[in-house]
Amino acid sequence: MSKQEQSNQIHIVLGLGCSGISAAKLLKTEGKNVLVLENNSNKNLLNISNKLKSEGINVILLDEALHINNFTPWIESVCSITVSPGIDWEHIALKELRGKNINVQGEVALAWERLTHIPSVGITGTNGKTTVTNMLNHILKLNNLNTDMGGNVGKALSKIALENMKNNDQELDWLVLELSSFQIEGSPKVAPTIGIWTTFTPDHLERHNDMESYFKIKRSLLEKSSIRIYNSDDQYLSSKRKELPKGIWVGTNQQSLYSQYQKFWIDQKGYIFEDKKQLFHSSILNIPGKHNLQNLLLAIAAAREIGLDDSSIAKSIKSFKSIPHRLEYLGNVNNLSFYNDSKATNFDSSITALKSVPHPIILLAGGIQKKGDFMPWVKQIKQSTNGIVLFGLSANNLKEELLISSYIGEIIVKKNLEEATIASINIARETNSRSILLSPACASFDQYKNYEERGDHFKNLVKKYKLIK
């Protein structure tokens, strides 16, 4: 292809979020002709658009639903289309583009091509993946390994690729990547050195349609990983053990003691073992919840495969703190503790939180309800709470389902999180509850940009009402 032909080739990026912006900048730095298409339009996007244009990146704010006709002006000259993870991989427009043999790829796939020479850990799962990603990155950094963390948490992978390109004199030792199902399905060539599967429960079924499709996407990452690590405490993963590619299994359940396939496990006294070798006591981890012991074992298994000794791992774990919005302890006033678990965007994640903080609890929940089995959540609410305050789009629907299930605690519906927080404080004091827990079990997009914004709002509300000194 001549230089003139190359200059006429257009690389289209879909989406003006963090992933899309990073992908566009990466392509532009490589000298590509870049066009970003965004199907929304507001003041913030306009500001971002103007900034990118000043850097020589073309941006069009469509302000309409994505359609194949949006690509008509460039259909003969498009070289690649890079898709942000928020856009459904099975969108009809993307299917039609693939049908025209156009290179349609996820943002992670674009970045991965520039990073394949760096050893990597790819962490996926319905819940737990963010904690494992942060914990493992913390362990590696404290042991003087040059790492970067990104994907679905931290930096967009394209940003890491761009930084690595500019700082090629400081080669990374390891990439620690959290990879969502959305990112995996658009990046079929991503093949980590180590793959970790934390948990598997219903989530994102409004996009993946059914559990089997969701499972296949997650499994594909492990199939392409050189070393595989699984959580045997997860019932679904354990039930599929014989179908999954061979790997390392970890578990906290007592039956792990007698299982032949556990490599990392915890005994009745809380000591962590690697096969028959005692490593150290699990109490060195200073964050609550049995699920975090599962996360700990997964991180330890990966660190051992990378080559760290057990004493170095233990020393690093002692300084690991809870991650914002994931069972984040905010403090205690008059024997009432406050927890921010805004990351709980599905029922299973909220169940884990309800099991992990002091009972009885006043629960704050609501937002956009996802598909999934409601009843296990209700069962745990009955066991753990004195009352529940609901807010957001699905509040009334959740209330109806709770009433049908014969929940006897107090149920209050409020318009927003601020009103809900005030109500929760009053109920907690009236019922001598020990904890107020924000664990919404729903997506945040009805009232917030993301779960982080929702969690930050809750933390500010706690400060506003002078609950935490």
Swiss-Prot record:
It is found in: Cytoplasm. Keywords: ATP-binding, Cell cycle, Cell division, Cell shape, Cell wall biogenesis/degradation, Cytoplasm, Ligase, Nucleotide-binding, Peptidoglycan synthesis. Its EC number is 6.3.2.9. InterPro entries: Mur-like_cat_sf (IPR036565), Mur_ligase_C_dom_sf (IPR036615), Mur_ligase_cen (IPR013221), MurD (IPR005762). One of its GO terms (cellular component) is cytoplasm. Pathway: Cell wall biogenesis; peptidoglycan biosynthesis. It comes from the Bacteria. ATP binds at residues 125-131. Pfam families: Mur_ligase_M, MurD-like_N. It catalyses: UDP-N-acetyl-alpha-D-muramoyl-L-alanine + D-glutamate + ATP = UDP-N-acetyl-alpha-D-muramoyl-L-alanyl-D-glutamate + ADP + phosphate + H(+). One of its GO terms (molecular function) is ATP binding. Belongs to the MurCDEF family. GO terms for biological process: cell division; cell wall organization; peptidoglycan biosynthetic process; regulation of cell shape. Cell wall formation. Catalyzes the addition of glutamate to the nucleotide precursor UDP-N-acetylmuramoyl-L-alanine (UMA). This is UDP-N-acetylmuramoylalanine--D-glutamate ligase. Gene3D superfamilies: Mur ligase, C-terminal domain, Mur-like, catalytic domain, NAD(P)-binding Rossmann-like Domain.
